[in-house]
From Swiss-Prot:
Taxonomic lineage from the root: Bacteria, Thermotogati, Thermotogota, Thermotogae, Thermotogales
Keywords: 4Fe-4S, Cytoplasm, Iron, Iron-sulfur, Metal-binding, Oxidoreductase
Organism (species): Thermotoga maritima (strain ATCC 43589 / DSM 3109 / JCM 10099 / NBRC 100826 / MSB8)
InterPro entries, per the entry: HCP/CODH (IPR004137), Hydroxylam_reduct (IPR010048), Prismane-like_a/b-sand (IPR016099), Prismane-like_sf (IPR011254), Prismane_a-bundle (IPR016100)
Enzymatic class: oxidoreductase
GO cellular component: cytoplasm
Residues the entry annotates as binding [4Fe-4S] cluster: 5, 8, 17, 23
Name of the protein in question: Hydroxylamine reductase
UniProt xrefs under Pfam families: Prismane (PF03063)
Amino acid sequence: MQMFCYQCSQTANGTGCTEYGVCGKSPTVARLQDNLVFAIKGISAYYYHARELGYDDPEIAGFLDEALYSTLTNVNFDAQSFVEYALEAGRMNLKAMQLLKKAHIETYGEPTPVEVETGTKKGKGIIVTGHNLKALEELLKQVEGTNVYVYTHSEMLPAHGYPGLRKYKNLIGNLGKAWYDQRKLFAEYPVAILGTSNCVLIPSESYRDRMFTTSIARLPGVKHIDGYDYTEVIEKAKSLPDLEEKPGSYKLRTGFSTSVVVSLADKIKELVEAGKIKHFLVVGGCDVPFKRNEYYREFVQKLPKETVVITLACGKFRINDLDLGDIDGIPRLIDVGQCNDTIVAIEIAQALAKVFGVEVTELPLTLVLTWMEQKAVAILWTLLALGLKNIYVGPVLPAWVNEDILKVLTAEFGLKTISEPEKDIKEILKV
């Protein structure tokens, strides 16, 4: 199948055009339109959360209108223009991430490094999953002074880095890892669960009656809460058995904001010039439950000790329990936050480039990313729009990428797919 499109009444056999569009659009144009729609979805997620906190940017809204319109039937048949739209989507996603970062920092303060517990405290519990910091804060306000303790899950882990959230004593720790462990995790702990955004899964019967959604998230058979009154969630938590006092086997570090890392720039420069730091790598992204994604842990474990790893998004859970130590006080593993905090990794790279007096593309920096869904598509186009090279992507190529699109991505943007950890490390470090 070269393409699939069934958005108009002319569609082949009334079921879908699969070789060429009845309208005349080529398979490559159809796939680039799909790519653009996926990027728009990713931008919309970050833009939505910024607007929840009262922050807006009409330029982003205007682009979303125009870009979506361009995919309408009989509007645009030009493949090159859709590549340009994708790059513009990358630039708009950069603005959306900047807007959301500003919203988070002005609302909750700039993150600072913190160690997060991974065990449980004696008392009642609520697990919060998703990405929505506002929903978390409103819940924390409502459980203050009670024995109902709140645990983050997956992409909510970075919440612990924000001073305005960390101040709440009922924010206890983090349970579980990436989004896909939730069915097992939520069934294991007798707690109420609040799903706040994307990355929720249809629940099993074992915990459906104690799960709630809020904001954009919806699940069949699960109570949805409009607004931020979480009384029902709290009462459900109170009705359940206590969690045991059980310390975790390790702690997780997060909260490395742009300012924190940039404050170390001169020290980092000294270490690079002394040969103690030889390469920086961004390893992270959206994780998937494929055996293939064991690659990322093995990759980091096999890196030489003169490397520093910046991680983010739920892909961090492949590696954030590893003790990589430090290089003269500079941590070798730096967690900068959620997937939208890709902006932090970008700002760190730009700051280091300035310190060294070079372009970002001239830094000893490689990106090794895992992708799962549409937000990752928007982020990839952001990186490409910034002119970044040395990007490795896995676990698989996007299904909508055909040979023509792949040629553009590899020839013009230098995109590579992951192979084997040792082979890629040798290629990256040129050893």
